[in-house]
Amino acid sequence: MTRVDTTLRLRYARYGEELRNSLHAVYGDETERVYDLVVRIINRAYRERSADLKALDEARLLQPDWLQLPERVGYVAYTDRFAGTLKGLEARVDYLSDLGVTYLHLMPLLEPRPDENDGGYAVMNYNKVRSDLGTMEDLSNLAAALRSRGIALVADLVLNHVAAEHEWAQKARAGEQHYRDYFWMFPDRTMPDKYEQHLPEIFPDFAPGNFTWDEQAKAWVWTTFNSYQWDVNWSNPNVFCEYLSIIFNLLNHGVEVIRLDAIAFIWKRLGTMCQGEEEVHHLTQALRTAIRIAAPGAAFKAEAIVGPEQLLPYLGKGEHWGKVSDLAYHNSFMVQLWSSLASRDTRLFENALRAFPAKPSNTTWGAYIRCHDDIGWAISDADAAHTGLSGPEHRRFLSQFYSGIYPGSFARGLVFQYNPVTDDRRISGSLASLAGLEIALEKGEADEIDLALRRITMLLTAVVGFSGVPLLYMGDEIGMLNDYTYADDPDHAADNRWVHRPVMDWDAADRARKDPSSPGGRIYAALQHVIGVRRSLPHMHASIESTVVPSPHQHLLILLRDHPQGRMVQVYNLSEHRTSLSAEVLRAHLGHSAWEALSGYDYNLDVHELTLEPYQALWFVAH
């Protein structure tokens, strides 16, 4: 028996039954037929996988916690806005490496429909890179260049829908029943109206409702997001097999992490919101198990921006514990950072984190402060009430504060998707503009500029210091501001999220790296330093959760990381005021002295109290 045969035999022995059971939970009597199809796809993918990628697989099998290591630091960018093309991005690998990046998420790479395309998420061809970015060969070359520098490439895969121009949709329109079965198509409004009774609207402003009449197809098509994005039917096993083949094609071109976009929506059940149904997790486990056989060095990241109780299943709950996605976004951490920054009060933050369910220890959070999307104020009424707040009133306050309407606000953001029925207002804006740098620079007041820079560096330090993989959004490391020229572009003018999707300012990046006293330089130098400190601390391993230490002062957030090699306590001042902290709080967890990792100083904790400067962060490590 050859080594290849032995490798596959051992992996099937380990994962074959799990794969079969996951498929059975969804496809029932069709399981054996589907399993045989899936095995053929797996075997073909394994044969086509390069020796270099197979070596990566073997290395990852020896270090299964590779995604949880302290040195894992993420960066998120649009290829065209960061470097023009995939080839152009190869020339920027040094920049990423110098910052400390080891995980690069490139926003939609695959060929979208030619017109309005939801920022690239209306994919027309999953097996072709956007022509303006390059080719699949360019993608492979970039992945290899990144891999040689220890940087894992992350790519999006939209699972819930395809563009109306996709080959499957075109064949469905032409009347081919095989492909009509790939979608949710109805001859009249009878079933759509029944489903609509329980479905929310994703884009109420410009895409109301969840179904669109298609004249060519002579059917009502399920279109959760936009009329040009057709929801696919995962109850059809042929759809599962199609997507598994797509995943392996990306992995065999060097992608190491697949971001499962809109994963929550892929299973439809009448009488529900059609989000997060149990079959979603069976399907994810089946996909993950399949890649464990042919490409075990790869991982899944769930794009599920939901509440805490709804989020845990995407990392694994019950029978799926630790067997679905490897990483998920900690949206609540991001929202609570912005909330506490506006209110100067961390009590709601404490309550929300304390109530957060524990994740499987082999999974990882993605922590972030900004991303390509808007900010939705995902603060539950229950968490707000527990803190003595009204949920609707607090969410309204945050929208007013970060759109600059609230008196005394330092922020400059834009309201996105106002829903008059729910009074929901989301916010667009860059980190620097929302944190006050834009207004401060306009005023030219040194004190306000200093406070804004302190806010930005504190927020970034909190993200780098939290559990999991910190995800830095392109340009935030140099304090890029809102880009209002989006309104001059007909393709972007109707979507103000483009205000925080600027073209990377490489002149500003060069200035920031050369002049650490400039505003951009202060942010870059501080972030680079914090990342370096993080890499040196075993306490930052993502298997360890950050837990709340009750703070005696509402301005301060105190987090404990209880690692086998010792304890770490992080303290963040989320206000512009000098704030005192009783040393007794620290002594209870660290003893009589501790090393502060960010400054490198030893602290005597037998004093009465410590004072934190405005927006200061302290990372204490027990001796």
Language model segments and positions:
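Active-site and adjacent substrate-binding regions of carbohydrate-active enzymes
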Residues: M1-H623
